[in-house]
């Protein structure tokens, strides 16, 4: 068995200021001839905006930031970094919530912000070819005159880029019916770590050979650098209507989700918020939410007017049977968007009631929603921190937002333990440690809970096939054996060590 990738690079923990300065000068000298002067940043005042992504609790100044403007420049930067054994972290809009774009102290942050052009919209084939830096929402805006749109819709769609969506396999509020990024992308084109062009998939509905496209989507920038994406477009529905359903008990709302799916109903959107989250967003956007409800469900139907009317009736009947106490049904498009505005602003609304928050991202079987909500309530007491809950309920994707003050080291520590507890509980209930935000650095230790050493070695094997020297986004996603052993040391429970079979270092 090959050892997991451990790049032979200067390690941040032992890097002296002088050694870092020498390395920086070497990298700047190598990259300066390859990109315009304004596209290479290394002074602290210029690189500080890149010191984190949406996970602001973790920060690291990059060695150098490169902002290439052409594909040839991207290839040249990658070739130079490969020659010098310099780590490369590709970056889109920096909206990721797991630290996937956290810089490497001795690496180059490769910003793809300049690759923001829509190459073509093809209404006949219902596809769009876009560069990696194009915003998610911009694709739908460009396709709108043709009566089409791009279905995956993360909450950050006004800012996040399609390249980042590919890296994380992003979903959104309508993924239950329309799928994740992997279900809506036909082709990805970019470069290998060596700067060689590579293409996965095709513009046809199927591509010959192994399905490497599915491996690249969701690989968090560890296998290749994406520059261009061909996405599927879908017709705008004739009509869409949303239901706000109130529940006097959070667990009843969880049971209602399972009941809807069990009844054979596939809503266009199915989202859930608990009372603390509802209060936060209602104060922020005035979406018309029931502030007395312990939880609300936003359930959407789309299609022809006849289909929507019939499905809305079925949805109401199922949720009423499950214990819903009140219903509000959108009367027009403006009211439907108003209902959704609260859900789409859940994160900024949380930022108004707490100095900081950490958004978790795990998945569980839908039938376990009620149980995980009860467990999270118990954890709030255990760790002495508040938590606002919002879920992509239809596919069991949880987004608990743990509220804390990052200026208080003890609160940050308790927040991290709280988050790890949520992830471990999700796995115990038959779920996973991540849904759509990725692993990044945030969930590295939790990967030790879900995957065995043999399974993690298979992941390293795939990484080695694409990136033998481990230079693309190193230290992310896949924990090493020693990392899992150290994680086991941190979580002694009743005198018993998890992962007792692993050597302790």
Q: What is the predicted function of each stretch?
A:
Residues 117-271, 472, 488-493, 499-505:
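FAD-binding subdomain of flavoenzyme oxidoreductases
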Residues 37, 427-439, 463-478:
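Alpha-helix capping/hinge segments and adjacent helical runs
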Residues 1-79, 96-126, 155, 275-286, ...:
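N-terminal flexible segment immediately upstream of the FAD-binding catalytic core
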Residues 81, 221, 467:
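Conserved, mostly hydrophobic/aromatic
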């Amino acid at each position: 068995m090959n050892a997991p990738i451990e790049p032979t690079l200067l390690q941040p923990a032992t890097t002296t200021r002088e050694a870092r300065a020498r390395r920086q000068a070497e990298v700047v000298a190598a990259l300066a001839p390859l990109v315009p002067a304004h596209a290479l940043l290394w002074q602290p005042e210029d690189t500080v905006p890149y010191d984190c992504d949406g996970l602001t609790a973790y920060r690291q100044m990059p060695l150098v930031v490169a902002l290439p403007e052409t594909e040839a420049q991207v290839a040249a930067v990658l070739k130079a970094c490969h020659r010098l054994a310099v780590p490369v972290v590709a970056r889109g809009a920096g909206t990721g919530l797991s630290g996937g774009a956290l810089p490497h102290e001795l690496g180059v942050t490769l910003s793809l912000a300049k690759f923001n052009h829509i190459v073509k919209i093809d209404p006949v084939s219902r596809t769009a070819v876009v560069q990696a830096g194009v915003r998610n929402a911009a694709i739908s805006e460009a396709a709108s005159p043709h009566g089409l749109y791009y279905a995956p819709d993360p909450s950050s769609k006004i800012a996040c880029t399609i390249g980042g969506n590919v890296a994380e396999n992003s979903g959104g509020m309508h993924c239950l019916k329309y799928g994740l990024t992997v279900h809506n992308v036909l082709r990805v084109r970019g470069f290998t770590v060596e700067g060689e062009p590579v293409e996965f998939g095709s513009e046809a509905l199927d591509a010959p050979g192994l399905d490497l496209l599915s491996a690249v989507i969701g690989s968090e920038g560890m296998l290749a650098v994406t520059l261009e994406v061909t996405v599927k477009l879908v017709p705008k529905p004739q009509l869409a209507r949303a239901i706000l359903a109130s529940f006097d008990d959070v667990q009843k709302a969880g049971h209602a989700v399972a009941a809807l799916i069990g009844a054979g109903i596939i809503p266009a959107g199915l989202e859930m918020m608990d009372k603390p989250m509802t209060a936060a967003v209602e104060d922020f956007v005035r979406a018309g939410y029931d502030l007395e409800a312990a939880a609300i469900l936003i359930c959407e139907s789309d299609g022809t007017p006849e289909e929507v009317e019939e499905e809305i009736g079925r949805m109401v009947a199922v949720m009423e049977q499950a214990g819903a106490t009140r219903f509000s049904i959108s009367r027009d498009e403006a009211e439907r968007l108003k209902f959704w505005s609260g859900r789409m602003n859940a994160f900024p609304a949380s930022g108004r009631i707490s100095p900081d928050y950490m958004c978790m991202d795990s998945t569980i079987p839908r039938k376990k929603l009620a149980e995980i909500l009860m467990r999270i309530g118990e954890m709030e007491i255990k760790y002495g921190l508040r938590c606002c809950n919002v879920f992509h309920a239809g596919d069991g994707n949880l987004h608990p937002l743990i509220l804390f003050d990052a200026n208080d080291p003890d609160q940050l520590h308790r927040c991290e333990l709280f988050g790890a507890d949520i992830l471990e509980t999700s796995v115990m209930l038959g779920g996973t440690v991540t849904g759509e935000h990725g692993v990044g650095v945030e969930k590295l230790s939790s990967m030790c809970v879900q995957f065995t050493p043999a399974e993690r070695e298979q992941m390293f094997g795939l990484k080695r096939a694409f990136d033998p020297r481990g230079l693309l986004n190193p230290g992310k996603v896949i924990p090493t054996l020693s990392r899992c052993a150290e994680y086991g040391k941190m979580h002694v429970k009743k005198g018993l060590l998890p992962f007792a079979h692993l050597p302790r270092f």
